[in-house]
């Protein structure tokens, strides 16, 4: 008999290698929304370019302490991540990292998330996923008592999802009491990084 070993992609890090070291973050002044968006854009540059996705970066911040809780980028987490194998969005990566830091499932993140958490994302959170996985808007709404504000760099281009579906996502956040604010002045740079591979 031949024992088959599980496939391991040498170009994708393991969950242990991602979670092992505590990431050091730059010091960004409280209320410097462009500074946080620049850091989210830096994360987006790590995302592998492909014609079937956008390169998105996100930063999750405890606004009361002005402390970065986690960062994430599209497809950052490996294929063997049980939370969402190989299809992790930037915002979701932020949530998974905080949950795992506390040995929790993402669904229990509300047990440890600070009451005044802010999310910075280079592209608006998805309201529909072609993969059928849970959209980022739904993930944020599950945490709406903790995530009070979402800062966005750009609207999602209509490459995959119709703009009307995306507008509904923004409206769902606002209707649930989550403030949605677009950071102006970085759109061209964010779009260039987001569209890498297209």
Spell out what each predicted region is.
Residues 3-198:
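Zinc-dependent deaminase catalytic domain
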């Amino acid at each position: 008999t031949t024992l088959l070993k599980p496939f391991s992609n040498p170009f994708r890090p393991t969950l242990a290698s991602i979670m092992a070291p505590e990431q050091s973050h730059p010091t960004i002044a409280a209320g410097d929304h462009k500074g946080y968006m620049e850091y989210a854009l830096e994360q987006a540059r790590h995302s592998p370019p492909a014609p079937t996705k956008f390169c998105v970066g996100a930063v999750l911040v405890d606004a009361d302490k002005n402390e970065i809780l986690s960062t994430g980028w599209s497809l950052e987490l490996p294929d063997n991540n049980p939370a969402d194998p190989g299809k992790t969005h930037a915002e979701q990566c932020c949530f998974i990292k905080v949950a795992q830091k506390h040995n929790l499932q993402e669904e229990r993140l509300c047990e440890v998330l600070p009451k005044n958490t802010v999310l910075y994302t280079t592209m608006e959170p998805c309201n529909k996923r072609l993969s059928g996985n849970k959209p980022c808007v739904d993930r944020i709404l599950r945490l709406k008592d903790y995530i009070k504000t979402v800062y966005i760099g750009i609207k999602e281009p209509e490459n995959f999802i119709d703009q009307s579906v995306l507008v509904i996502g923004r409206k769902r956040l606002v209707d649930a009491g989550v403030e949605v604010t677009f950071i102006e002045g970085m759109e061209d740079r964010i779009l260039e990084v987001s569209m890498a591979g297209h």
